[in-house]
Amino acid sequence: MLLSACQNVKKTQLVLFETLSFDMSLKSFEEVFGEASEVVEETEMAYRDTWHAEDPYFYKTGRLFYDYENIALNGYTGRARFTFSKSHRLEKATVHIPVTSKVEQQVVLNNLSQTIKKEIEALPDYQSMTTDMVGLYDDGYRFKVKLKGKRREFWIDVYPTEDEDAKEIEDKKYTIRVDQFRMH
């Protein structure tokens, strides 16, 4: 009975990835998305003597990061990282889209923001949305989405980033970053 009740829980669809949803199992994700370019297991540092913060060691948390290169997203190509919880359920998606200039970065930011807003409003269980400015210079957007029948909001951040150290690789200097996650 409990198993069937868990299977009937509606999942929250990710924006820009219509075949993916939060809490999706690792197996289902791999069936839809295929093999990752790289899989990384999260490690954290702890101390054997916590009182004095001595004798550090690393341990695996069980969280997994699936990295994909050359992901096509609304006419743009970038790289994506999907984060899975300790119970191996999808909890976050991050996409980096490289652009060639600051001007192109602003154009892509505006286009993606409008596309994301339309996709949010088209979700079948869409209820409401608020938009805040985010980013170092308040030059990005945070869409806080409330869905019917859900207690937790999910947020989508769309903002420009700049790598100051990327002098040689000009096409990697400017990017647009899109994060999707649920607020607890």
Predicted regions and their residues:
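Amphipathic alpha-helical segments
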Residues: 20-43, 105-127
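N-terminal, post-signal-peptide region of Sec/Tat-exported proteins
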Residues: 37-71
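Short, recurring structural edge motifs at helix starts
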Residues: 13-19
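Long, charged/polar, surface-exposed segments that mediate recognition or autoinhibition
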Residues: 70-138
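Bacterial signal peptide processing site
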Residues: 7-9
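C-terminal motif of bacterial Sec signal peptides marking the signal peptidase cleavage site
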Residues: 3-5
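An acidic-aromatic pocket/loop used at catalytic or ligand-binding sites
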Residues: 139-184
